[in-house]
Amino acid sequence: MIPRLLPFFASLLFAALLFPGLSNASSINHLVTEPPSFPKDEFPARGVNGSQLLHHRVKRLPPRTPPYHEPEPNYQIVNCKKSEGQCQEYCNFMETQVGYCSKKKEPCCLHPF
């Protein structure tokens, strides 16, 4: 008799492991209709239209106050006429930028031909 019950209990255990939420299905429907309970001193944040704000507070950095040192520019000013380049607003396709013409950051572009 024990060998006959073993497959039955094994299949029952297997079904219970596959579907663990079925035993609590009736209590889930009951819990969904109840509003969430909060302690009296801690209510969730409310938005302008009454919706709950779900994001958390972000730690903000203090504002930068003078005197602070700006990073040095890492661009190189070159003599564009000497390198047979052309100063223009931006380099076109297949042109190579060799540096900048002035502090206005106009690139010095070399033509490929």
Swiss-Prot record:
Disulfide-bonded cysteines: C80-C108, C87-C101, C91-C109
Cleaved signal peptide residues: 1-26
Cellular component terms per the entry's GO annotation: extracellular region
Localization in the cell: Secreted
Alphabetic keyword roster: Antibiotic, Antimicrobial, Defensin, Disulfide bond, Secreted, Signal
Main location: secreted
InterPro entries hit by this protein: Defensin_beta-like, Sperm_Ag_11A_B
Superkingdom classification of source: Eukaryota
Pfam assignment, any one: Sperm_Ag_HE2
GO biological process annotation, one example: defense response to bacterium
Family indicated by similarity: Belongs to the beta-defensin family.
Function: Has antimicrobial activity against E.coli. Plays a role in the defense response in the male reproductive tract, contributing to sperm maturation, storage and protection.
Name of protein: Sperm-associated antigen 11B
This protein's encoding gene: Spag11b
